[in-house]
Amino acid sequence: MKRITLWCMVLTGVLLAPAAGFAQISCSREGLQRAVDLYIAAQTKGDTSGLPLAMGVGYMENVAPADINKGLIKTPMKIDHVRSLLDTATCQTYTEVIVTDKEHPYVFGTRLRVNHDKIAEVEIIWTTTGYWGFGADAYLNYSSEEKWDTIAANKRDTRDTLVAAANAYLDAFLEQKKDLVPWGYPCNRTEGGAMHTGRGNADDSCDVGVPSGVNISNRRFIVDPAIGAVVAFCTFGAGNVNGGSGAPDAHLFRVESGKLRFVHTVTHLLQANFQGGQRGQRGGPAAPGRGAPPNQQ
């Protein structure tokens, strides 16, 4: 009898082991970090078989529905840098990914949405060679030198404060009301990698080159107060001639004591279609280049 009971316990443990591994995914910080870790492992291998994907999982690239079996997530790559936001209020994560491979470099942002113990949505905005302001090596250099440390609980900004800071910055592109933006000093902005503000001085500012007349629309936020970070998935303009191209875009912010400290952008717009005479006027009336990753075309 004891032998039978022991055998049943062992069998039960074996059968439940995989489920227990996937069950670590949840809306807690630990569960969301587990989802990110599994995603990074899958992205590195270009193999989603190890991901606990929900039935009918949603997959998008550059704000358009895409086939997960043909997407960037299926492209193996050596990842040089990641930075993640964990949003326990909405069960979402955002991960900034930099790949400096000479043949197939990338900078992209990935959003995951977790539903209980499954990944229900995967969304990627990617850029690579030939896209607006792209420079993976420079992006890695700037991003890896920045400090996005965990902020002490008694010094953290609220979720509302972080979203308000992001909105104020993005709103300034439309009406030039820059005095409403909580500028911090120093503040450094990295756009695509090729463009960067800041020289390591105490008065470095992100208050440069902000255009007017660009309606940054379709905003969706992922917020992580623990590291003072918020990212806006958006379109750079409303998709008309006077209001910007409508190119898929991710704006990532680090906020310290209510003030902007770092700004990162990833914009999915072919450089050849860039028509702006100044920073911010990205593209013409349409947002081009929303197809498969270049090395899969």
Please place each PLM-identified region on the residue numbering.
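Bacterial N-terminal signal peptides that target proteins for export
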Residues: M1-M9
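C-terminal and inter-domain tail/linker signature
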Residues: F22-Q297
